[in-house]
Amino acid sequence: MNMGRTSNLNVKNRDLKRNFFSNLSLNVRVLLLVFLITLIVFYIFFFKPLNYSILYNNLSNDDEKSIVSRLISLKIPFKFNQNHSELLIPSNALKKVYLDLAEQGLPKEKKVGFELLDTEKFGLSQFNEEVNYERALEGELARSIQKLENIKTARVHIVLSKSSVFIREKKIPSASVILEIKPGRYLNYNQINSILHIVAQGVSNLQIENITIVDQFGNLLSSMNDLYNDSYSNNQLKYSNEIETGYKNKIESVLVPLVGVNNIHAQVTAQISFDKQENSEERFTPNYSNEKQSVRSVQNKKNIEFSEKYSDNSFSSNQGVLSNKKLNDLSNSSLLFNHNNIPNFSEQVSSTKNSKRNLSDESVIPQSSTNQNYIVNYELDHVISHNKFNVGNVKRLSVAVVINYVKDKHGKFVSLSTDKLNSIKKLVCESVGFSRKRGDSVSVVNFKFSTPEVYFQSPPSNYNKYISFNNLFEFFLICLGVIILCLLIIKLNFLKILFKNKKRIDISNNYAVKDNLTSQNKGVEDDKELKKKLSSVLESDPKEIAMVIRKWISG
């Protein structure tokens, strides 16, 4: 009886363990659900990752040590980025930390800008004012340069020109920039050129040629010739690639509708001239014909001279020249006109007339001289031409086109006919602007393409991503704590249920024991009554009892 009861108890315990959640009451289930939701909300609001913001970047070693020790004393969490260049703290504590560090005077190596001029004292000398202005200007330029990518720190030194009435030759301003580049980074031409222009535009009368840029290793970065050559070569390569890609796209856009998308491959090589050419030409064309002649100016000059010599025979003492008279008539005219009958040379006409006459009372010898110059100036056929050729002209093109076989009616791949290849070649020539003068070459061939093998690549797994060990350990501890709490709650409820069941079992066992006891008591009472009856029978009829005992013995 006892063995059967213990086996029944074990079966009941197993059923209780298996059907624990089903045996739970509705109130207990609701309480468990509310508890789990509370844990999730608690984790989201109290254990979520903090939003970090940049406190300072590119700190020196001394400032970094001082600031970190101060954050530790304030019990504010902090961390650095992967490059160890930015100090990060929670965003909600940013203002508090700024104020506290400002009270401590941190960081000490902070760049000073134009705010230095706000604290000038009264009675400051001119020299101190100039020095403060230079310091403020250097600090502002250094701040601007440090905003650029790949630059960790920057220092700027400026020598300004001093104007004075006693100095005739004005000093040219100059500047030097020292850059500390981030590890593993470099500056390209555009970034260096931008730094040069920032400094040049920030200082009055400063030329780019007077700016020197040096990195932390002592390398000179401001060599304009090298910068220009590097940039020019990069731009040339980029321009050539764009030209070749444009021609390639033109070829594919023409041939793809004919042969299909994946049935054509084109390659274009362009030789481009980047030489700068300027041509000046001056030509003189002779204009012998009268129709092409154009008169620029005409000069007509006429000079007439008169002289008379009188001689009287009655006056012997007054022989000789009695009178001498000259008349000069100068006529100059400059005319601008076109005339077909005017010769193309200078004409000079000279005429001299002499006349003599004899008088009775005197001897008169009149003389006249005429000098005439006629000059015509013609315009020359003069042509001056200035030709400037564009940079980036295509000198020669080489085009190669490969076309795949096409399918026939039976689905087999066959080559294209010669006529089709020739027509395709003509289309290619027209699309790229083929020119024999340049020596362009176009080649179109027909081959069967090989079918590429398809490799299925699995999508990238998230397990390959970088996971911080600290975050993983914290998450593991949180999950472990939640699991332990859930197990404790489940165990407590299970123990409560078991305790109730044990009470029920004990009560039932007690009732069974009582039943057994009552049955045993009833059996004892029955034995007593039998004994009484036997004793009464023995007394009344001993012979019958002897007969019964003999039968029991005989069997």
UniProtKB/Swiss-Prot annotation:
Q: How does it sit in the membrane?
A: Multi-pass membrane protein
- What residue ranges are annotated as transmembrane? 30-50, 472-492
Ordered alphabetically, the record's keywords are: Bacterial flagellum, Cell membrane, Membrane, Transmembrane, Transmembrane helix
GO MF term set: cytoskeletal motor activity
Q: Which InterPro entries match?
A: AMP-bd_C_sf, Flag_M-ring_C, FlgMring_FliF, FliF_N_dom, YscJ/FliF
Where located?
Answer: Cell membrane; Bacterial flagellum basal body
Q: Which GO terms describe its cellular component?
A: bacterial-type flagellum basal body, MS ring; plasma membrane
Recorded hits in Pfam families, A to Z, give: YscJ_FliF, YscJ_FliF_C
Q: List the disulfide bonds.
A: none
A GO BP term, please?
A: bacterial-type flagellum-dependent cell motility
The UniProt record lists the keyword Transmembrane:
yes
Superkingdom classification of source: Bacteria
Q: What is its main location?
A: membrane
- Can you tell me which residues the record assigns to a coiled coil? none
* PANTHER family linked: FLAGELLAR M-RING PROTEIN (PTHR30046:SF0)
Stated family: Belongs to the FliF family.
How is the subunit organization of this protein annotated in UniProt? Answer: The basal body constitutes a major portion of the flagellar organelle and consists of four rings (L,P,S, and M) mounted on a central rod. The M ring is integral to the inner membrane of the cell and may be connected to the flagellar rod via the S ring. The S (supramembrane ring) lies just distal to the M ring. The L and P rings lie in the outer membrane and the periplasmic space, respectively.
Q: What does this protein do?
A: The M ring may be actively involved in energy transduction.
**Protein's recorded name:** Flagellar M-ring protein
The organism named in the record is: Buchnera aphidicola subsp. Baizongia pistaciae (strain Bp)
